[in-house]
């Protein structure tokens, strides 16, 4: 088996680690999938424990950061880094440990961008914050910032790398389909940041 394939499989399994689910159980919240949106990501954890949501966000970002770091250690081609990030994000969205029902991939995307290009990551985070302050929708902020990151990647990176990132962005936006429908119906919940 090609060693790069081994790396991608490893990235998938690392990406599959459901930190939101694990932390919720360990801290006594219970199965986070049975509350709110049913998602295991930081936004849904936020509805139960705001400080725990921050830890979930950091760990979900860290796992993809680690995946990309592993890929770089064994291959200097930046394209491999984009693929490693993609597989980590797929793992997060469709975790083998939770019967392939996971998060939406936003935190892992941020983590991988921090490693690949911190400038794009900074733009991603900046636009997320600005959008969120304006609308209070985490879902819309995630979609907008993902598209902004895609614009930067398409501008400064190769066609192949841009295509890989476009696939990643499409997956993330697709994971937000229910949120998009709720926003169109004006039934999407806004996030209250008060601690």
Curated annotation (Swiss-Prot):
Classification via SMART domains: G3P_acyltransf (SM01207)
GO molecular function ontology, one term from the record: acyl-phosphate glycerol-3-phosphate acyltransferase activity
Its biological purpose: Catalyzes the transfer of an acyl group from acyl-phosphate (acyl-PO(4)) to glycerol-3-phosphate (G3P) to form lysophosphatidic acid (LPA). This enzyme utilizes acyl-phosphate as fatty acyl donor, but not acyl-CoA or acyl-ACP.
Enzyme class (EC, first level): transferase
InterPro entries for this protein: G3P_acylTferase_PlsY
Keywords (A to Z) from UniProt: Cell inner membrane, Cell membrane, Lipid biosynthesis, Lipid metabolism, Membrane, Phospholipid biosynthesis, Phospholipid metabolism, Transferase, Transmembrane, Transmembrane helix
Keyword flag Cytoplasm: no
Topology class, membrane: Multi-pass membrane protein
EC numbers on record: 2.3.1.275
GO biological process terms on file: phospholipid biosynthetic process
HAMAP family: PlsY
Pathway: Lipid metabolism; phospholipid metabolism
Compartment(s) where it occurs, according to its Swiss-Prot or TrEMBL record: Cell inner membrane
An example Gene Ontology CC term for this record: plasma membrane
Membrane-crossing residue ranges in chain numbering: 3-23, 52-72, 80-100, 113-133, 147-167
Catalytic activity: an acyl phosphate + sn-glycerol 3-phosphate = a 1-acyl-sn-glycero-3-phosphate + phosphate
Assembly information from the UniProt record: Probably interacts with PlsX.
Pfam families: G3P_acyltransf (PF02660)
Name of the featured protein: Glycerol-3-phosphate acyltransferase
Family per record: Belongs to the PlsY family.
